[in-house]
Every structure is written in structure tokens, then in C-alpha cells.
Amino acid sequence: MVYDEIDPFSDMLVEVSGTVPFIKLEYPDISGDPFLMENVKYEAAKTDGLSNGDVVTITATASKTALKAAKKVFSRTTMQYTVEGQPFYLTPDTVLNDEQMAALRSCMDTLVEAAFLNGGEDVQHGAQGYLYGDAWKYWGSEPTATLVSCDNLEAVVFPASGGDPGYVEFLANATVTFCANQGNAQPETFSACMCITSKYIEMQGNDITFWEVSHVSFAENQEKAVLSLRKKDPTCKEIPLPAAE
């Protein structure tokens, strides 16, 4: 009996969707061959929680009876698919190359610059809270916050959990001049750890494709800020950022 050798993966379309570590692998279109569609079962060793670089083995199986009746034999029963080029969330497990580190530094520079636009609109609430606590009587109708200096930049990265991609705290030693009420209060210059919370950082290749500032606050110093963050989650990771080019 002559058997027709067929490749069960010849027309397989593999689709990868999502963002690492929430990648999902599917193979919605197998083949137009009626035999393959009706008799072959495909199973991937892993379909969820994939990362770039993961190699997934997909296995094709069919009953001996079906193969014999159709006079067919498989040329292979497994294929390997490599996940690559997918966007990823920055997590404590992410290993960054020099270009990605530079992109992260550039992102923080942008966040700091944006925070002090419009009289430091995004910083005003955090500055007043740091200086005066709940003494809202110091708050005026035209507050301003101006950045004097900023150095020792770092990111503290929190892990993904469930469907939450985690978040990032950008920290820096900052000197800021704050005036609670123009014309009725003297400007105050203070030095503290500025904390810029980003909901998450999404990257693809060497580029940052998404970030979003949640809020800006201040702590007494960077060491205490990190200790406070580690109390929230001991698995968070500090990433010192390179000097600006």
C-alpha cells in the first residue's frame, strides 16, 4: 500500500497576541485540507505567559485508523515556534540592554520636564503636601513649582500580578522652589526625593511605546523612599539609570 506523505504544519498560521508577560499563542488557521481539519489534533506545550525568546513545541496527532483509511503518513509530528518581537511590560525580571536603559533614562527626563510645565502643575500638590502636610491654608490660587536641579535618577519596578502589568516609580534627588500663593507667600526651596509614579512602562525592541504618569510626590530622601516601596512589595527591583548623554 502506498501512503501519501503530508506535512500537517505546512499551512499552519501561528498568531501571538498581547504584551509580555501576558502573551497568548493561537493557531486559528491550520489548513484547507479536509483530512487535517477533521482528523488532526494540534496541541502547543504552552500558550499563555510567554516571553520573547520562548520556543514553543506544537504537536500534531491523528489516529492510526484515520491515517490508514486516508492512506496518509505525517512527514513530521512536531514543529517549533519562537516568540519574538512582541511588546513587553517592564518588570523586575526584565533584562535591559544599553539602548533600552538609555530609552528609560530619556523617558524619565521627559516625565520630569512634563511635570514642571504650567508652573509645575503636576508637582504642586505633592510639594504642598511635603512642605505643609494637611495645612491647606497655605494653598493659594496661583501656586508654582520650579525645578532647580535633579540627579541620581533610578526606577523601582514592581512585578506584574494577575492581569495587572505592575507599575514603576521613578526616583530622583530634586531641588524644587515652591510658592504656595503668588504675592502672599515667600517661595521655599527644598531638596527631597521626587517620586514619579507611572502606571506601567511598555516597550518594544529598544523603544518605550507607552507610559502614563499617575502622580508626583516627595519623600525625605531616596533611601527612605526605596524602603517604603520595598515594604509594599519586597520583590520590587531598583534600576539605576545612566547619566544623560
Please annotate each region the language model reported.
Residues 218-245:
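C-terminal partner/receptor-binding element of secreted or periplasmic proteins
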Residues 69-88, 180-219:
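A short, surface-exposed beta-strand/turn
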Residues 115, 201-205, 243-245:
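Extracellular/mature segments of secreted proteins
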Residues 103-147, 158:
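Short Lys/Arg-enriched alpha/beta "domain-start" segment
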Residues 110-117, 121, 184-186, 209-212, ...:
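Viral structural modules
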Residues 36-38, 42-44, 135-154:
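Membrane-lipid interaction segments
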Residues 1-115, 180:
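Beta-rich interaction/scaffold domains
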Residues 48-61, 147-187:
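Exposed beta-strand-loop-beta-strand "reactive/processing" segments of non-cytosolic proteins
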